């Protein structure tokens, strides 16, 4: 019994010592993050797809603070770009795409290899091995990571069809608008 108590006490002491060491190291080597970069990263879709030319959303947020264009996030689209512009106090830039798109799988050509399912960062593709797959349109972020691994090229990017639920009124001109003067 005494051996068990001494073993527990020694392990507890080592754990306490390691915890104190880690706590000290966390305080000693703490690096202050740029709050603007953190806010930008929160606005980005976090798919880390690399379509902007950076290895993920964090490096792209850092690049924006260093002067990179704010309109390179294809999955985020116009809404994310406008949010970034509003946060930084700059004018929105034109998006160089034709609008939002989602992946479409030709289910007759799909062989059910699951390669697309494995690379989708948001789990927007459903299906089983050796069964045809389909895309959950509401979840697809248009990152296009599913296109390359598909051995049958049965995945294409299709424009998001407009419907009555997505339609919105144009914002009216405000009292300070040049359109009224």
From Swiss-Prot:
It holds the Pfam family FeS. Residues 101-130, 131-160 form the 4Fe-4S ferredoxin-type domain. [4Fe-4S] cluster 1 binds at residues 49, 52, 57, 73. Coiled coil: none annotated. It is an enzyme of class 7 (translocase). Gene3D superfamilies: 3.30.70.20, Electron transport complex subunit B, putative Fe-S cluster. [4Fe-4S] cluster 2 binds at residues 110, 113, 116, 150. The keyword rRNA-binding does not apply. Residues 1-26 are annotated as: Hydrophobic. One of its GO terms (cellular component) is plasma membrane. InterPro entries: 4Fe-4S_dom, 4Fe4S_Fe-S-bd, 4Fe4S_Fe_S_CS, Elect_transpt_cplx_RnfB/RsxB, RnfB/RsxB_Proteobac, RnfB_subfamily. One of its GO terms (biological process) is electron transport chain. Residues 32-90 form the 4Fe-4S domain. It comes from the Bacteria. The keyword Membrane applies. Transmembrane segments: none annotated. [4Fe-4S] cluster 3 binds at residues 120, 140, 143, 146. The complex is composed of six subunits: RnfA, RnfB, RnfC, RnfD, RnfE and RnfG. Belongs to the 4Fe4S bacterial-type ferredoxin family. RnfB subfamily. Part of a membrane-bound complex that couples electron transfer with translocation of ions across the membrane. This is Ion-translocating oxidoreductase complex subunit B. It comes from Magnetococcus marinus (strain ATCC BAA-1437 / JCM 17883 / MC-1). The lineage of its organism: Bacteria, Pseudomonadati, Pseudomonadota, Alphaproteobacteria, Magnetococcales.
């Amino acid at each position: 019994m005494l051996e068990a108590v001494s073993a527990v006490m020694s392990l507890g002491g080592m754990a306490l010592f390691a915890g104190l060491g880690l706590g000290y190291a966390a305080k000693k080597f703490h690096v202050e993050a740029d709050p603007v970069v953190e806010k930008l990263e929160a606005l980005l879709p976090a798919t880390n797809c690399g379509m902007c030319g950076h290895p993920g959303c964090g490096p792209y947020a850092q690049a924006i603070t260093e002067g990179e264009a704010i309109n390179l996030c294809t999955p985020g689209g116009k809404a994310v770009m406008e949010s970034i512009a509003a946060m930084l106090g700059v004018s929105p830039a034109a998006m160089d795409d034709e609008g939002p798109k989602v992946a479409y799988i030709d289910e007759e050509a799909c062989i059910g290899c699951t390669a697309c399912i494995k690379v989708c960062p948001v789990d927007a593709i459903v299906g089983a091995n050796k069964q045809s797959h389909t895309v959950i349109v509401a979840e697809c972020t248009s990152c296009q990571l599913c296109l390359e691994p598909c051995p049958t090229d049965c995945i294409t990017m299709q424009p998001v069809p407009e419907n009555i639920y997505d339609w919105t009124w144009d914002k009216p001109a405000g009292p300070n608008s040049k359109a009224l003067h």
